[in-house]
Amino acid sequence: MQKTLKPLRLPQETATLDNGLRVVVHEDRSSPIVAVHIMYHAGSKNERVGRTGLAHLLEHLLFEGSENCPKGQFDRLLERVGGTNNGSTWLDRTNYYEVVPSHAVELALWLERERMGHFLPVLDEEMLDVQRSVVINERKQVYENRPYGLAYETLQRLLFPEGHPYSWPTIGYTPDLEAMSLQDASDFYRRYYAPDNAVLVLAGDVGVEQGFEWGARYFADLPANGGVRPSPAANGAGTGGGTQVLEDRVSFPRIYHAYAVPPYGTEAWVQLDVLSYLLADGESSRLQQTVVRDAELAQDADTYLYPTELAGIFGIVTTARSGVPTERLAAAVDQVVERVVQDGVSEDEVTGAIRRARRDHINAMASVEDRAEELAYAATVLSDAGRLDEILNQYERVTTDDVRRVAREHLGIDRRATVVVVPRREDGHGQ
């Protein structure tokens, strides 16, 4: 088999300030814009039982102003120069970014300096109460009141043992959010919002030396907090916690399978990603050919693989056609995976899956904003932005034996958590 693929490379240079902040610069002069991206090595996994949702709530609070930038001024300043900004929280990290014309980079850096070093003086009970309500409403709208909205948090709770840092959702639980105190928020901020727990990426129309100089100018005098590292000590392995059925306001049953697998950055993770594409991406993929098209058991079939730090999470999701029992669909999905284990896969299948995976990785780095986030994530969870190139170029080395092996080792039924979402009986539907 010939898999002569051009190596993928995302050029970058990294410097580390005396206070521990890593500054990564990716130069791309094709457009006069720059993405300024700050990522903190703290997400929902750094919370504790009883205070879930704290990382995400703090992200909301950190858009409410700072000591030298009053509430509302942050967005107004960026709008004046034609910039945009946003942030997000996930299991392993929290990130903030601005995309600005290249002449406005220093404004974005000053704003992020304010967020990192000058937030606590403005944090008060009123701000906390307002944002707590916003997040609780977000939970209701996005999860509790949306069809299938509670499936993934239930799946995480089944897959990982009680108290594991991945066992609760990033949005948190409402009772925990209601119990959150000002002290909780300030303690989390002090512990994790420090230069030695952050990565700054400048991507776009900026030179490497200029980027390093700006990073030092705006952040070098902010104090480190003593080499803080993410706190979870839990084993990354999941428990494969059985099956749970949820009734919801949905028209069709949906089956969610999840497996705890090796973490992002390992060769096995890349091999599992190829397996993911082979199973469900494209008309020629195994699940599309069998359960969707030939057997007509499912309306759709999808897979996913989270690039997470303590353990990867591999998922298979299928939506049943009208009248198809969930037991029959689940058995068909199991049979597809078992055939990979027993009979292996073809070189053509693996080559196609690799090419589709590379296509998606390339598309995911189309903008400087996307590239900044990818570099920041690699620098955060793998400790080196340069590891991104290494991972991207591992794909073409994946073999048929690799795919068969990781399916056998990591996708066993005994290692799996399953959530089945079915229509509520009062809706007049059955399985």
Language model segments and positions:
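M16 family metallopeptidases and their MPP-like homologs
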Residues: 24-26, 31-44, 53-57, 71-118, ...
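An aromatic/glycine/proline-enriched structural segment found at the starts
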Residues: 2-5, 120, 161-162, 170, ...
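Conserved, carboxylate-rich catalytic/transport cores that coordinate ions
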Residues: 189
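N- or domain-start disorder-to-order transition segments that initiate the globular core
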Residues: 3-32
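Short, polar/flexible loop-turn hinges at active-site or ligand-entry regions and domain interfaces
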Residues: 46, 64-68, 117-126
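Active-site SXXK
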Residues: 52-66
